Amino acid sequence: MYLTLIILPLLGSIVSGFFGRKVGVKGAHLITCVSVITTTFLAILAFFEVGFNNIPVTINVARWVDVESLYVLWNFRFDSLTVSMFITVLIVSSLVHIYSISYMSHDPHNQRFFSYLSLFTFMMIILVTGNNYLIMFVGWEGVGVCSYLLVNFWFTRIAANQSSLSALLTNREGDTLLTVGMFAILWSFGNIDYSTVFALAPYYNENIITIIGICLLIGATAKSSQVGLHIWLPQAMEGPTPVSALIHAATMVTAGVYLLMRSSPLIEYSSTVLVLCLWLGAITTVFSSLIGLFQQDIKKVIAYSTMSQLGMMVIAVGLSSYNLALFHLVNHAFYKALLFLGAGSVIHAVADNQDFRKYGGLREFLPLTYSVMLIASLSLVAVPFMTGFYSKDFILESAYGQYYLSSTIVYFVATIGAMFTTLYSAKVLYLTFLTNPNGPLVNYKHAHEGDLFMTIPLIILAIFSIFFGYLTKDIFIGLGTGFFTDNSLFIHPSHEIMLDTEFAVPTFFKLLPFVFTVSLSLLSVLLSEFLPKLLINFKFSRLGYNIFSFFNQRFYIELFYNKYIVEGVLKLGGQTSKNLNKGPVKLLGPYGLEKGGLALSNSLGNLSTGIVTTYALYILIGLIFDISLLYFSYNDNNLLILIIFTLFALLNSNKK
């Protein structure tokens, strides 16, 4: 069953990609969807068998690397962390496959699209099941390549080309440091197998663990779009909307957080890495929330919302609450996929326009889409008893419950981020569905809900967004849960804060995020409805214009990168190519070898004079040289060099 679970998406991808012309569009739909849905049911069985029974399964497939002391097996491990990620990845992936049947129905390259989707799913499965860092890295690079292929699916669009390259190159920065971290693990521990590394981690110097942890954190920063290496995420919205739902909800962006959770037995022994995670997540949460508030593209707003929630997960990792980070990751996948697919339904209905300032009044035309996006938004802002409430608010409470200065500051910073998350969620809903119509009349004439293939995934995800958090909270974060007793997640006893979070945090600080978010949402709606002139006048004032430009242009970070980093790197590359590659390297390399070979062949050709006595002299010199070589190899080497030099001088004089 477990090998079938891994192989099925790959088989679907191969059939759809290589035999698409034979099976046709409907055949590609059927094969890829059946393979992924079957894999999903197998994953649910694995969740109950492995997770609830605490019976990790390891499958050894083949020997991969066997060089001196390095021995790497191609093997897969199924534990509670793996099967929890399966639930997220495969349920969302199967629903995205079904949704794409209708959404991509008019595209001429359906087989290629579904092949990429299934390949993406397969690579994510490899990433979460790998039993060592090397196999994990295969899946890590695989999802990066598939992301490039999917974002650049409409390859005739310049914006898609640029966005896919941005995603690929930005992730290479993190991948480079992750590779350095893997080499550091290999150098320190002598192996890259999870069980070996994690068993030895307590006995190693904290400085070594810190260096390795920072390398892993930078790798996760790129993949999970944290501040500094985040610029690829909003640009990746150029791909089809189902791709956005798959990449930014359940697969690629969660890979970085998964890496940190999987490495919990390692980074738990470095307080520096945990503090870095804490602050990185807090800064990312506020940073992305502020930018998202000033965007006008509906998909980019949701993308920055994803970035904000990933920051929350990294905060949970910094608090050593890995089970809480996993719980939020799983919850977030469902309501974020619902937001993206709901946005896709809106875009599909209004002739592919993504600027929500040109929507308005769509509640009457898209009642189902409005309902599911309302549910997803309520879950995103952690309204009580929705799925997001059980994990997001618990992360904020845990930050306060650690009772350190840094975690208390992070609590207030993350609360501010949650407030702005509520604001832009209300903004999207209000301007898309509730305000007066602002778009062209022709869009409203043709606006309609999608067919069954588009509506069924929305309804299923809406159910998950309401009930999943309540039904599974005791499994993931309950005080008596035994779900993680297989040691897939490790929390050092001195870092355990779950009891303090549950019972010691004052009620005021538990309610503060909810009160702030509701108050700010009501204030924003009141200002928009009853005092719109005040907002408009402020926006067109000099101060308002500067504030809007600063946040709308994403803190000018991309401008800074392009002007000072990219330009400098390109100049350095140009000078290196001009002065080094085309200079000494070329002289010593191809050009020098060519000229040297020609000169040598000409010199040897000049020795052929056609005179018998000259050839007799060559034979005599060769004989003397051989005898001298044997004799002087046991005596003075300097004399041997002198004789060789004399022979060459005689040859040259004879040639002249």
Swiss-Prot record:
Organism of this sequence: Aspergillus niger
Keywords, alphabetical: Electron transport, Membrane, Mitochondrion, Mitochondrion inner membrane, NAD, Respiratory chain, Translocase, Transmembrane, Transmembrane helix, Transport, Ubiquinone
GO BP: ATP synthesis coupled electron transport; electron transport coupled proton transport
Molecular function terms, GO-annotated: NADH dehydrogenase (ubiquinone) activity
UniProt enzyme class: translocase
GO annotation, cellular component aspect: mitochondrial inner membrane
Keyword Transport carried by entry: yes
Family: Belongs to the complex I subunit 5 family.
Protein name: NADH-ubiquinone oxidoreductase chain 5
Bilayer topology term: Multi-pass membrane protein
